[in-house]
C-alpha cells in the first residue's frame, strides 16, 4: 500500500523536528482498508506523534453529488485523483490553521513517472522522500525499524505494512507501480 511511504515520511519528520511537533492524519475513504488505518495508528503510537482520523467520505460524496457526471465520464482517474486532492485540502487546512509545515510523501520513482497528483499527494512545503527511489524508501523503513529496536523501542513500521501488496485504495482495484 501507499501507507509505507507515509510512515517513513512520519519517521523522517519525527527525527527532524521531534515527535511532539508532528501530526499524523489518516484520511480514509470508502476504499480504505481498516488494516491501513491500523498500521498508520501503530506508527503514530510507536513514534509518539499526535494522530487524527478524518474521513474524506463526506467531502467525496458532496463533490460527487455536484460534479459526479464529470467524475464518472471516461477514465476513473478523475475520481481517484479527487480523493488525493481532498486529502491535500485537509492536510493544508491543518498546516495553515496550526502554523505547521505539510510534507508531501512522494518518492523519486513516483515523481519520475509523474505518478502523483497535483494539489493532492504533492501538497506540502517539503518532500523528504523526493530524492529516494521506492526501494530506497523501503530500505529507510528498515533503518528506522532497526534503530528503534536497537534502543529497545517499538519498530515504527509494522512488518505487515512492508509485506502487504501495493494497493492505492482509490478504487476497488488500483495498483501502485
Language model segments and positions:
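Structured core elements
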Residues: 8, 23-26, 50-55, 60, ...
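A phosphate-binding catalytic loop at a beta-strand-loop-alpha-helix junction
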Residues: 1-18
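A conserved beta-strand->alpha-helix junction
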Residues: 21-75, 84, 110, 156-165
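Short, glycine/charged-enriched secondary-structure capping and boundary segments
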Residues: 13, 38-40, 67, 116-120
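Mobile late-domain/C-terminal helix-loop "cap" segments
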Residues: 130, 149-171
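Active-site adenylate/phosphate-handling loop in enzymes that bind or generate adenylated species
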Residues: 17-18, 72-150
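Solvent-exposed alpha-helical segments within well-ordered globular domains of core cellular machineries
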Residues: 10-11, 15, 38, 92-93
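Single conserved hydrophobic/aromatic residue that forms the stacking wall/gate
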Residues: 4, 169-177
Amino acid at each position: 500500500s501507499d501507507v509505507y511511504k507515509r510512515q517513513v515520511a512520519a519517521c523522517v519528520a519525527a527525527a527532524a523536528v521531534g515527535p511532539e511537533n508532528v501530526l499524523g492524519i489518516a484520511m480514509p475513504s470508502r476504499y480504505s482498508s481498516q488494516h491501513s488505518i491500523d498500521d498508520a495508528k501503530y506508527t503514530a503510537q510507536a513514534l509518539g506523534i499526535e494522530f487524527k482520523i478524518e474521513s474524506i467520505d463526506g467531502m467525496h460524496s458532496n463533490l460527487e453529488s455536484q460534479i459526479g457526471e464529470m467524475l464518472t465520464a471516461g477514465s476513473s482517474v478523475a475520481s481517484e485523483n479527487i480523493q488525493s486532492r481532498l486529502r491535500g485540502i485537509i492536510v493544508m487546512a491543518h498546516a495553515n490553521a496550526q502554523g505547521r509545515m505539510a510534507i508531501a510523501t512522494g518518492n523519486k520513482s513516483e515523481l519520475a513517472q509523474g505518478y502523483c497528483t497535483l494539489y493532492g499527494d504533492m501538497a506540502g512545503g517539503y518532500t523528504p522522500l523526493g530524492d529516494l527511489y521506492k526501494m530506497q524508501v523501503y530500505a529507510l523503513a528498515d533503518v528506522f525499524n532497526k534503530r528503534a529496536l536497537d534502543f529497545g523501542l517499538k519498530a515504527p513500521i509494522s512488518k505487515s505494512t512492508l509485506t502487504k501488496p501495493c494497493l492505492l485504495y482509490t478504487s476497488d482495484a488500483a495498483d501502485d507501480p
